[in-house]
Amino acid sequence: MGFLKSFSEQIHFFVKDNFTDSLILPFQIGLKMLLLFAFFFVIDILLRVTITLISRIFVRISNNEFLNFAYKAKVQNSIAHLFSLAFCFWLIDDIFWRHPKSFTFFERLLMFGQVLVFAMLAYRIVKTFEAYYIHKEDRYRITAIKAISESLRIFGMVIFAIIGIFVIFGI
C-alpha cells in the first residue's frame, strides 16, 4: 500500500472513530479533499519556483525580448498550474480509493480547473504579444494586434465558458 493510500486510510479510520454516523462520509470526503488541495498547493509552489527560476535564467541567457515579455506576463505560472493540476488528477485514485463514487466529481472539478488555467494561459500569451508589439512601436501592427487580441479575448471567454459547462456536466 502506497503512502497516499495509507494516509487516506488513516484519515478514513480517524473520522470513523471520532464522528457520528451521519457525519462520517461528509467529513471523510472533506478531509481527503483538503489533503488533495494541500498536495496541489505544495506541488504548485514547488513547480512555480522551479519553473520561474529556469525561465528567468533562460530569459537572461537568450536576450529575446518576446521571452522577456512572456516572463513579465507570468506565463510560466500558468504552465506550473497546469502541471500541478495534472499531477493532482493522478492522485485522485490513491486518495479517494474508498469512495469510488466521488471520482467523477473530483475529476470534473480538476478538469474544470484545467480549463480555467488554460484560459488564463491563453489570455497571458495574448497579452504578451500585445506588450511585445507595443514595445516594438510598430503603429500599424499595434492597432491590428490590439483589435485581434480583444477579439480573441471575447471569443476565448465564450469558448472557455462553453467548455467549462461541458466539463462540469460531463457532456
Name each region found by the language model:
Residues 1-170:
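N-terminal membrane topogenic module
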